[in-house]
């Protein structure tokens, strides 16, 4: 399955919530007056959804929010199911640990897609916990571990899009599980977020029910 490259706002409208696929310069409800309307000719026509369709819709929503493809998502679920504790919470934590997501959460990318591009273009470095040196990486799916330090490479620090993203991030706020110094363009992943710190609009139990069939 190829990565979606069409209009991002249409995806958010389809899911009925802001998937944070746009920069956030304008609020979601301001960018479109159709915020509560599903795209298409019959967007206002809503049939009663089946249990399966609700579960599938929730999976699609989370995949699109984090920019993850089907096979990747299924692998994340399998690994989460093997871990102790709540499978759904482990799944969300794995998605939050993705390097592209961490770069976005730290405020170096205005969207996850932009953060993914920064990583792919080798503009991001990582220093593993206990190590002394940073290493340039280009794999967005790297799982960031507690104590890892993420930094923008020296050659990329003057990029206007990074500076704009930082400005947006100061308005949005930085999650408590991260420690970021925007003046140095680096930050530390302190620990995995608790469920209460993660997006409230996600109902991960529906995803667990879907994969449990």
UniProtKB/Swiss-Prot annotation:
InterPro entries, A to Z: Ribosomal_uS4, Ribosomal_uS4_bac-type, Ribosomal_uS4_CS, Ribosomal_uS4_N, S4_RNA-bd, S4_RNA-bd_sf
Highest taxon of source: Bacteria
Keyword set includes Ribosomal protein: yes
Annotated Gene Ontology cellular component terms: small ribosomal subunit
Residue ranges occupied by any S4 RNA-binding domain in the UniProt entry: 97-165
Coiled coil: none
Ribosomal protein in keyword set: yes
Keywords on record: Ribonucleoprotein, Ribosomal protein, RNA-binding, rRNA-binding
Record's protein name: Small ribosomal subunit protein uS4
Gene behind the chain: rpsD
